[in-house]
Amino acid sequence: MSLLTEVETPIRSEWECRCNDSSDPLVVAASIIGILHLILWILDRLFFKCIYRFFEHGLKRGPSTEGVPESMREEYRKEQQSAVDADDSHFVSIELE
């Protein structure tokens, strides 16, 4: 007898899933969550530069000025610029006598 005839080969029925409760709502919910997580992770990796650039610059725009008169907008811009200028003056070198 050769070795090839002695080797046990699995039949198709042994390869199939033996889970009888695959229609369990918890299993279905876990599968859906897993698939959604995988899709979101792939999209995040593909478009991460666009996504995070939008959040980084989009959140720094400041409050909306829609419906605000132009004079008040200009006053707000001046206040913001003076706050930036005051912050820059913090790093002025001091000369001692």
Swiss-Prot record:
The chain crosses the membrane at residues 23-43. GO terms for cellular component: host cell plasma membrane; membrane; virion membrane. Pfam families: Flu_M2. Residues 71-80 have a biased composition (Basic and acidic residues). Residues 44-97 are intravirion. The keyword Signal does not apply. The record marks W41 as: Seems to be involved in pH gating. Glycans are attached at N20. Keywords: Disulfide bond, Glycoprotein, Host cell membrane, Host membrane, Host-virus interaction, Hydrogen ion transport, Inhibition of host autophagy by virus, Ion channel, Ion transport, Lipoprotein, Membrane, Palmitate, Phosphoprotein, Signal-anchor, Transmembrane, Transmembrane helix, Transport, Viral ion channel, Virion. The record marks H37 as: Essential for channel activity, possibly by being protonated during channel activation, and by forming the channel gate and the selective filter. GO terms for biological process: protein complex oligomerization; symbiont genome entry into host cell via pore formation in plasma membrane; symbiont-mediated suppression of host autophagy. The modification Phosphoserine is found at S64, S82, S93. Residues 59-88 are annotated as: Disordered. Homotetramer; composed of two disulfide-linked dimers held together by non-covalent interactions. May interact with matrix protein 1. HAMAP family: INFV_M2. Forms a proton-selective ion channel that is necessary for the efficient release of the viral genome during virus entry. After attaching to the cell surface, the virion enters the cell by endocytosis. Acidification of the endosome triggers M2 ion channel activity. Cytoplasmic tail plays an important role in virion assembly and morphogenesis. Belongs to the influenza viruses matrix protein M2 family. This is Matrix protein 2. The gene is M.
